[in-house]
Every structure is written in C-alpha cells, then in structure tokens.
Amino acid sequence: MPSLDSLNCRRSLEVNGKTYHYYSLPEAAKQLGDISRLPTSLKVLLENLLRWEDNVTVRADDFSSLAVWLKTHTSEREIQYRPARVLMQDFTGVPAVVDLTAMRDAVSRAGADPQRINPLSPVDLVIDHSVMVDRFGSDQAFEQNVEIEMQRNGERYEFLRWGQQAFDNFRVVPPGTGICHQVNLEYLGQVVWTKEENGETIAYPDTLVGTDSHTTMINGLGVLGWGVGGIEAEAAMLGQPVSMLIPEVIGMRLTGKLNEGVTATDLVLTVTQMLRKHGVVGKFVEFFGPGLDHLPLADRATIGNMAPEYGATCGFFPVDQVTIDYLRLTGRDPDRIALVEAYSKAQGMWRDSQSPDPVFTATLELDLSQVQPSLAGPKRPQDRVSLGDIGASFDLLLDTSGKTQQADTAVPVAGETFKLKHGAVVIAAITSCTNTSNPNVLMAAGLVAKKALERGLKRAPWVKSSLAPGSKVVTDYLERAGLTTYLDQLGFNLVGYGCTTCIGNSGPLPDAISQAITDNDLIVSSVLSGNRNFEGRVHPLVKANWLASPPLVVAFALAGTTRINMDKEPLGYDEQNQPVYLKDIWPSSAEVNEAVSRIDGQMFRTRYADVFSGDQHWQSIAVTAGDTYKWNNNSSYVQNPPFFEDIGQPPAPPKDVENARILALFGDSITTDHISPAGNIKASSPAGLYLQQLGVQPEDFNSYGSRRGNHEVMMRGTFANIRIKNEMLGGEEGGYTLHQPSGERMSIYDAAMRYQAEGVPLVVVAGKEYGTGSSRDWAAKGTNLLGVKAVIAESFERIHRSNLIGMGVLALQFVGDQNRQSLGLTGNEKLSIRGLSADIKPRQLLTVDVERADGTRENFQVLCRIDTLNEVQYFKAGGILHYVLRQLIEG
C-alpha cells in the first residue's frame, strides 16, 4: 500500500536510463530539520517509516522522534519497522515452516482459506546447519558427508521441498551450497531493493531480519539486518511489523590500518572485547572514521557477523566506494551497482573522506595499528587472549579446574602411539561464515600450509582437521591460487559447505582419542575460525575452545597443543632438526594480496547461476503437491505442533501466577545453547530415550538442531545441555533438578511433566545475560511447553527476551541490586507473581511473593520486560503467532 507521504517527500531518480521513485530524506529534512548527521543506520529506519506511513502503525510523529534523536541521542519511542525480506537457515527454518503449516491447518479448521497463510515478504531459506564432519582427512570426505547428510535428513528435506512449492515468496537454497550469511553477502544482498507499485519502480534500502543471530554479517555491506527468533520472523513474513524502540547508537571510530601479519579475525576479537566491556546490548553500533578507507569489505563483514558476540543488535557500515568495489568483485548486476551508488548519494547515506561524523549516543575509538594477533577463549568470544599468552591462559584454566599439570596418556593413531596431554588440540577447523567469507584469511591459511609443508612440518596425528567454507567460490579461488593441494596434504580436506564445527556439528572424535579424554579426564582444546566457543558447543568432550583466524587454525594443527607461546616456541622441527617458528611460515601481505588478485566476478556469477537448483540428491526428492501437508505420525523429524490447538477459543486474560515452583536456578551467562542445545543427543537423556522408543538407534539420532520440527524431541531437550548447572544441585552438570517438595532428583523434563500433572505452574530463576547466544526460538518454545510461566533474571539478551514474550512467557528482571543470591533463593520456595491483569502496561513493576519451606513469607519487585505496546497485545493473545493467526482467521 502506498505511503500517505504527509511530508511530500516522494521523488524520482534517473539511473542508466531507468526511472526509480523513492522517499527522499533530504526532502523530508525540509520539514524535520537538518538530519545530515543522523547515524546512517537510523536514516535507514527513517526511510522505512516514511515509506510505510499509514497513520495507524506509522504516524508522522514517528519521523519527528528520529529527528529529535539528534538532540537527545536516545529515545523511548516505539516504532513499527518493516524489513524488506527474511533470511532463514534450516535449523530455525524447519520449525518456522512447521508453524506456518500448522497455521494453515488451523485456518482450514476454522473454515477459511489456508492460502491466507503465505509469506508477504520474500523469504530465503538456506540449508546449511545439517552437514556434520563424520568423515575428514581424505579426498572422499565431502562426498561421504553429503551422502550421510541426505540419509539422515531425508524427512526434513522432503518437508522443505513441499514447502518450496506450497508457499509463495519462499525460496530454498539446497544443501551443499553454502552458509546462509555468506550466500547473503555474496549473492542475495542487493544494498538497494526495488519493487513494482502501481506501474512504478520503487527503490529503497535492502533490509532484513533473519532467524539466525549472525544475520548481522550483512551490515558489512551497508544492509541493515539482524537476527530475530523464528517466532518473530514468522510474524514478519505474515505482514506483522517488527515492534522496536528507537535504539541508542554507539559510534566506533576507526583510525589507522592493520599492521603486517594482523588479520580481520584479530581485529574482530579486539572489537568484541571492547564493545562487550562498554555494554551495547540492545543498541546499534555504527563504524565510522578514516580507518574505513583501509578496511576491505570482507573484514567489515567479519566485524558485522560477530555483533551478537559483542551484544549489539547490529554492527553497521555505511555504503562507500569499498562497497561498490565488492559488488563488482562478486559479479552483481551493473545496473544494480549504479543504482546503489546513485541512491546512496541522493539519500545522504554515502560515506567518503569528506563526510561529516554522525552524532552518536556514545563514541569509542580504535587505532587499527594497535591490534595484535589474538585468539578468544576458552569459553567466551569476548575473552580475547594475545597469541603469545595462550599457553599461560590454558595453564590458568588447568589450575582453576584443579587438574594436575602433567596428566597424559598413550593413544594409538594410524598405527603409531602418541602421548595425549592436557591442552592437546583435538579439533582444528577452518569453518564458519565469520571467516570463510574473507579471501584474505583463507588465502593466508593456504599459504601457511604451503610454507609448512615446504619446511617438512605435518599436522599432529591426534588433530581432527577440516575445511568447511561458506560458499563454493572459496574452493574455486583456493584451487585457482594453487593452494588446495597444500591444505589437503595437511588434512584440511573439504568436508562440506555448511556451518559444521562452528555450530557443534564437529562429528565424532576417533574412538581412541575419545577414550583417552574420558578415562583421564583430560582438558583438551579445539581451535576454530568460528564465532562461538561456549561450553559444550563445539564437542561435548572438548572443554577449552579457542576462536582464531584460519591461518592460526593451521598453525595450531601443526603444533598440536594450545600450551605453547607461538611468539617464542617452535611449531615443530624440519628434516634437519631445525626449529620452525610461526614467523617462518607466516605469509606477507604481498603474498596474500597476489593470491587474492586471482579472484574475479565470473567465479561468483558461475557459482550462483543455479543456486536454487541443488544436486541430484536434492532434485530426486519426491514431494506431494498441495496447500496443506499430510503429516506422518511416524516421523521422528516433523510433527504437527500443539501451539494452535486452542485457537478457536478466545484467549484468557492475563492473571496472577499462584504458588509456582522453581524448575531451575541458574547463574550468569546461560546461553540459548544451554537452554536448547543444537548438538548431540545423549542416549540416556529424555530425548534419547524417546527416540529409542520410536525405534531410532543412537547412531541415527542426528542432532537436536535437526529435530526442531518435532516438538516431542525439543521439549525433552530443553535445559538438557550436558554443561548446564542448576544451582539447586550444587556444581553438578547436566539437565537435572530437584522436584519440590519431595526433593527427588530427576531430569528437568521429567520434573516439569510431574509438575504439570500436579497442576503446579513453574518459573526459572537466573543471573545476568540470560539467553545470550543464538536466536534460538526453541529456547522459548521449549520453555513454554514445559509449563514455565516466567523467567526471572538479572538481565536478558535481546532476542531471547523477545522470543519469551512471543511465546507468552513472562521475562521478569530483578530491580536494582537484588538477585537470587541477595534474596536467598534456594529453589525450594513457592513464588506468586502479582499485578498481572488485562490492563498490563509495558515495563510495569510487578510483585513476587515468596513462601519459603519453613512457611516464612516476603516479597520483592521485578520489572516486567514486556517492552512495547505491541508486545502487550501479543502477550494477551497468548503469543505473537496466536495474535497474527486470529487476525488472519478473522480476515
């Protein structure tokens, strides 16, 4: 629907002989006042509001609020934002399509047309989360892993093939193609989007939300995008605006340029550490300053990618000549490139050396020349460690873990016996869109491999090594540069095009290695070029996980240990028994640039010409056409969820929660991995026992992430991470709790089901940063299905808070300095939440009454983190999807 355009700012633009219509920010400024120094990211929001003005969801005073932001640098204004498109990966995409399919069933039951459930915005789903590193270290590894992937995921892929034909505006990028964020960066992202409206072509900024927290990678291209839960993304697909507060924007001024030998990975780990320390949760970060002139777009994308790790909603880079050069490099359409430049300049969104610095809420500064070679670990991405300090950092981990320094064990590998010690690198993975989208660090890794082999070095035999790039272009350019053979010889053979180790799909370790780790309680390491290293994520047996650049991943595979100072100690010895140091095999910038210069646009155009076609495996999947899906009750992967069974009944008004029990008591930094793990399913876990009852053998369990289309598996997997610690059981790891008042120890799932049978509502209590990590909607869905009415925490990560509200679960925040410890909560109390009613307001204070086991009573206040009026509506309806579905049924 055309905008009301109350500011009369619609104008036209001629580019290469074609006329485009757009909503002009300079014209709007004639009534709003000078907005030239508004952060570019907020200019994108302002254009969105101008284009969607309807006097219902978007009003003229919304524009004024953004203009006033220039004076106040902050705002309490809620706006309704409509992104141009939605991006999904298959772990989050399958449950979203399951929900849409179940909504069609609900609409059909209500006597309406199921075609009412269709994406209104373009949706791209990239299958990248399912491939595992089952085979490695051989030329056959890729084909073998593809075969195994297709066998494991046949039910899921058949369902997605059905969805591809059943839903409009819905495209699927088949498995074995790449990682969604890299495909988005190299192909899907347009920077400026166009659509036909009443016979005219409208141009506007390319914007998106994605069902993966690292959607922010596209910010490096000047495209505003961030991760949301699958729940919120589904609502956006169906025409619901994204409700948000106008954010604070933190400016990060970059000066200087990176020194010789310093990589984009070193830079992003430094940025992550700085911004986490400053505190940017729920805020935009925008990069500016003369340092951008020396920062390639691939480096910008790496920084944008890790916005979830530094806590920001996004990490945005404005469009400039570097953007245009990248669009040309990746083979984009010349007319689109011309439009991007002309539109950005016409809108005052173009950056160059003459651009005035924007006004920000606060500003940080980083001199790029001060960045040092770094890793991050062993448990958090923000814990940066200088390369020379990693050995000391690991020894500190040993000391705090109470381990003996010299523990080791003999391990037979490939016919030889080796000593496996604390700190041994058992996984070295060149993985993840974060770094494999960056030709500079990929070429550097290949050059390190080449130089290492020339000096006679080999990969340590206990290291499981792998190469899993985010697009097929990567293997093309490594091959063209003549570097593939060297990576292969060191065991970094191609294992797949997908997320693999970065998301926990590292596959099994060799039996002898696993046995040695388990029998001797060894703390061993993984080194990966990924973006997350939370406990239990990479591999359940690997407790120390280090994020590093691809060339450093190769170096640690050579050294075989993280108990090393690579600045001073050799990686190994050559055939003359001379020490070989990292500096001896590290490539110069000139060598890297020479290799990168071989990349051209035709490589990208060729690979992306048939990106939606898939291989013979994909094309051979048979599907039955139809508007509604024929559910298979015997499927262990895809089941009709229970979320919409009561949609025919009016929602009950909010009411107080009476005499709830505490299901679990957690500490700080409980991640969505802790709440809803994506990796291995333990045979003895509730989910494992359920699958075995269906006749699924443990070797065929696949992963939690692959089974998100089956609510029975996922609710059993909620709070089932093997590294989660419920304080009700002291320091014990695993998804267990104490049932109250019996005090009986049992799995969290079994306790929740017992409480449901007893008619007892539940709450979860936690510390700071609850729900950090992936945009995992099942972390909220599973919480809901366990019967949890509220989560009370000291603070919430942005996406998970939104997801909880979207599933009808209260997110309640302790006030002031209060927390579970200051209030003496132990887990055996009864909690009642007072103040819930039909007239609940955003960010209202509620009262929690506490009844202790000895009968004593007290109370404390909490801040209800229903943050916006839209969220109030969603909560009253029982959740955002219930709200949208009722609207669609009612027409």
Predicted regions, residues:
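Long, structured ligand/cofactor-binding scaffold of large enzymes
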Residues: 54-257, 264-269, 373-376, 390, ...
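Extracellular/luminal Protease-associated
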Residues: 288-295, 531, 752-753, 757-797
